């Protein structure tokens, strides 16, 4: 199953990652406000999320001439938030895309990745994300998903939880 392959590769990638948790750096990042993803989605009427994505496992390379900041700037005035794919191996994303977009665009940003470690939550906050995506199928134990939701809330996020069936919905709500 592709999700299992992505998650396995993500764990290996994180083991080799240069990112090291630094509480002072995280607290400094938390002093700076980020645009509220929740407020952008809770407004009256239709809410639109633009996506910055270079590739996908199903479609391959989507945009060969890929400039994430320029794509994000094109969304300004047309969308309420931006989803930034940061998964490197299958989507050709990068955490740096998120950081650069945050520096150049004043919209709520969703870090869209396969979160398998709390470090990814901390890193997302440091890079300027407004929230993160948690996939119930990846964090498929009640205590793990609940723990990650609490960690995300602890850094100021209201995480977006993706579910695929009734069991996962119950898991997310418990």
Describe each PLM feature range:
Residues 1-109, 116-118, 151, 156-174:
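Conserved N-terminal beta1-alpha1 strand-loop-helix module at the mouth
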């Amino acid at each position: 199953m592709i999700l299992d392959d992505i998650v396995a590769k993500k764990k290996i990638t994180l083991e080799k990652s240069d990112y090291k948790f630094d509480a002072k750096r995280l607290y400094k990042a938390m002093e700076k406000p980020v645009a509220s993803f929740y407020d952008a989605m809770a407004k009256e009427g239709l809410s639109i999320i633009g996506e910055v994505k270079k590739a996908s496992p199903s479609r391959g390379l989507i945009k060969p001439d890929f400039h994430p900041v320029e794509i994000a700037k094109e969304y300004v005035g047309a969308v309420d938030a931006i989803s930034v794919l940061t998964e490197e191996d299958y989507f050709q994303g990068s955490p740096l895309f998120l950081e650069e977009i945050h520096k150049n665009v004043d919209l709520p940003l969703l870090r869209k990745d396969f979160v398998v470690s709390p470090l990814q939550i901390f890193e997302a906050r440091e890079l300027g994300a407004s929230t993160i995506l948690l996939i119930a199928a990846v964090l498929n134990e009640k205590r793990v998903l609940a723990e990650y939701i609490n960690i995300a809330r602890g850094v100021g996020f209201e995480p977006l939880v993706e579910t695929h069936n009734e069991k996962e919905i119950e898991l997310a709500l418990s």
